[in-house]
Amino acid sequence: VVVPNLYIVEQPQADALRAFVERGGYLVVGPFSGVVDATEKVHDGGAPGLLRDLLGIEVDEQWPIADGLTEHIDYAGETLTVPSWSEWLEVDDDVEVRGTYASGELDGLPAVTRRAAGAGSAWYVSAMFDPSGLIPVFRDVLCSAGLPAREHTDVEVEVVTRADDTTDYTFYLNHGRTPVTFEIPAAAVDLLTGSRHEGRLELDRYGVAVLAAPRAESIPFATLIPVKEDA
């Protein structure tokens, strides 16, 4: 479950998210979350409010980045760009720091954290990245959940998989003006055209395909697509 900016948090929401994680779910919470209740009253202790115990972090100070400046985060050896928003975090002893600020006033402080809870884990992302910056973060989340991740670097491409008990349905959408080609590791049938594809799928500009494959032969990865800034 990904909650990019859950500004308003009430107790039922916090309880549901905790139950989800403790049952084995993976929760990713974005910056400026858990700030107020439904009446716009700031939670005692500040953000992330009712999610504080689950995430194991406290936002000591919200740290907007001035226009024209950028800061950076070191994430497993990769340098991620932060153009607009960061937060000063205090973390509990049982929290694992996955990414660290690598410039500016927050240099050396935690930026992305993970805390185990029950059978799952709760992650907090304290910065607003540029679109490509989320790729290594979600690669890490998927890997820790035992889900291989395959990336497509074209921000105008979207790939989403849905499934029932027997079949995976993978939706390919090309939002761009140029054709794109995908490598697919399993034979599949396009439900829109009836065509069978093996190894490769080519989509024209603004093209769409819905590929169906048996679960045993289904595409064994998730594809990460960064959101366009002007979307």
Feature-to-residue mapping (PLM):
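A conserved amphipathic helix/loop scaffold
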Residues: 5-231
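N-terminal Rossmann-like NAD(P) cofactor-binding module of classical short-chain dehydrogenase/reductase
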Residues: 2
